[in-house]
Amino acid sequence: MFDEVVIAVLVNKTKSTLFTVPERIEMIGEVTKVFPNVRVDSWSGLLVDYCEANKIDIIVKGLRAVTDFDYELQMSQINLQLKGIETLFMSTAPAHSFLSSSLVKEIASYDGDVSNYIPAPLLEKLKARLALVHGGN
């Protein structure tokens, strides 16, 4: 579909993340290294500004549910108005439509099995970080 895919890890001041931006970049790079046309980068600012600075014409967003669409539609319209950047929406596989990072972290924090929801190389990193954050409890 695209000659190059850029996964941009953005700093979101309103969200509390479990991993730092460099850690997230490293983990994404680890699981996408089999795809030679995928590049991982980071940005602190608006996604449309990143797109403009890197000559990216299309933002691809995954949609899980109607609630995602409501928010992402507003974002896509403002992104188009601000910088002329189009957004392509792709629906997620039905088997994953209920997933969120919060849900996966909660299940894992109670030693639940999340191996079907995250790439195998990242499972131990998630468990180790949750143990550190929760003091081993």
Segments and roles (model prediction):
Residues M1-N137:
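Nucleotidyltransferase catalytic core that binds NTPs
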